[in-house]
């Protein structure tokens, strides 16, 4: 049943020309939606699915530190690329790591991130992303 539902994604919510995912059929694809979609596919065991690979290419193409849903999108894009592994993960981590370091704010000894979703959530999400290669969380242990 899951395979049938997943295969329906291509015709319903993935943009044929851009390869990103939309929220609803016929909608515009977006960075955060694509990140959540390819991570969800991987969680369902579709690690090598062409939708995941195409979605990853879309995320590299559309990456922007000015993205409206930057934190939310990267909270899913980072583990999706981590699961892809190899050079893809290495390139993604260099890209997101450099971006997050530039966006970090300093208040004395305190380093944090801010955004429209709030300082606490942004800091927790970005610290989790930066910590992925250190395998602190069991989810990211290999």
Question: Model-found features: residue ranges?
Answer:
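An alpha-helical repeat/solenoid feature that recognizes helix-turn-helix modules
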Residues: 1-57, 62-95, 111-142
């Amino acid at each position: 049943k899951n395979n049938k539902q997943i295969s329906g994604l291509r015709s319903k919510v993935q943009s044929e020309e851009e390869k990103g995912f939309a929220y609803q059929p016929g909608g515009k694809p977006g960075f955060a939606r694509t990140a959540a979609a390819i991570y969800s596919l991987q969680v369902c065991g579709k690690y090598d699915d062409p939708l995941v690979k195409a979605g990853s290419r879309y995320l590299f193409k559309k990456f922007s530190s000015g993205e409206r849903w930057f934190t939310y999108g990267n909270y899913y894009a980072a583990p999706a690329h981590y699961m892809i592994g190899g050079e893809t993960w290495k390139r993604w981590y260099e890209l997101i790591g450099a971006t997050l370091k530039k966006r970090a704010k300093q208040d004395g000894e305190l380093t944090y991130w801010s955004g429209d979703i709030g300082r606490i959530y942004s800091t927790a999400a970005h610290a989790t992303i930066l910590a992925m290669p250190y395998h602190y969380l069991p989810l990211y242990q290999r």
